[in-house]
Amino acid sequence: MGNFFRTKVPAVSPGTSKVFGAALVTAAMALPSLQFACAEAAPDQGVVSFKYLHYKDSQIGDGVSVITGASSAGSSSRMGVNAYSMNALVPVAGEWSIGTTYTSDSVSGASPTYHSSALTKMTDLRRAVDVELTRYFLNGSLSFGTGYSKESDYISRSFSLQGSLSTEDKNTTFTLGASMNSDDINPVTLPGITYKKKVYAGIFGITRVLSKNDIVQLNLGYSNGNGDFSDPYKLYDNRPSERNNTTILARWNHHIDMTDGTAKVSYRYYSDTFGIRAHTFEGEYVQPLGRGWTVSPILRLYSQSEADFYVAVGAAEKADPTKPTKPTVDAVYYSEDQRMSAFGAITLGLKVSKQLNPDWLVDVTYEEYEQRSKWGLNGNGDSGLAPFGARSIQIGLSKKF
């Protein structure tokens, strides 16, 4: 099935809870991850790659929006990220491979204490290492992975096991995987206190070759999380100690003979016990231009409903952002984190790559992200939240050996 699809047990614990919002996750996902499992055969060449990602987000006032063309002067910067990642895949003895990824990202800027107000300055540095060992068989593969991530207030450990099995004609592949994340959170504002969280996740996928030009894939995922999901850096934030989610992901890749290009479309549905329902549609068109050049425009549409316990911006806070909205006195759970609100988002991107020779490849990806409360499918998000936007650029270089 070539490189059309690679299924991987989903990451079940984002980095630091105080920083990584929807836009940052979108940018961070562009970094390389261990996706060597479930190939049909052991690689005959090794690969070493380097990626650099620069990300910057802001609250948009009234100047020009790159995506909508609307005015958005007076925007204020929030978070900035510089991330470096090195990735290596090494074949071993014809039936094995070892893959490893090292990532270092520095974060600086300001994060809201409630809703999109009371920005608090912060800086942090995260380092992460992932290792994956894969054994290849005649009609399948089996992979074991482990990872470790550390920053000033957050330590995450992960383990994963995933296997694939293909039919004799190689036209259908079944994938089954499981993972576990164990996280320790030590808020700098609460010295001596440690919060813990564990998340178990599983995935089942089917990939099918329909024709020489078409491949489809369907993945079903489920995760169960227990521990502290509250954000200790928010003014009012007390979330349930259990969070379960279900995901459905459908993909279709179609090769167009006339242009030698490939259209890639996907749809992802997400549902969790916090009450959030989310839809993601993504389209990408990969067009070779000759002389080793390839260009790929990208469109991503996202919409989510609000969590059951989200507290919207009140009238007093709308009039004076320095006056936070208090939860009702009888509220057991509550959050004023804008990531728990209902919103919609649009991402436009462009990737350009150049095959320098059979072994060397360089690529650049630029993405522009904008988020609005009124862009959700139901159209009734929290109007008191400031619009949000982000830009990212990623540069990659890889070499086969």
Where are these regions (language model features)?
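Outer-membrane beta-barrel "beta-signal"
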Residues: 348, 387-401
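Outer-membrane beta-barrel translocator domains and adjoining extracellular loop/strand segments
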Residues: 60-70, 111-117, 154-162, 185-193, ...
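Short sequence motifs at beta-strands and strand-loop junctions characteristic
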Residues: 42, 56, 76-80, 121-125, ...
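Cleavable N-terminal export/targeting peptides
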Residues: 1-45, 375, 401
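Repeated loop/turn-to-beta-strand initiation elements of outer-membrane beta-barrel proteins
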Residues: 96-98, 139-144, 169-174, 213-218, ...
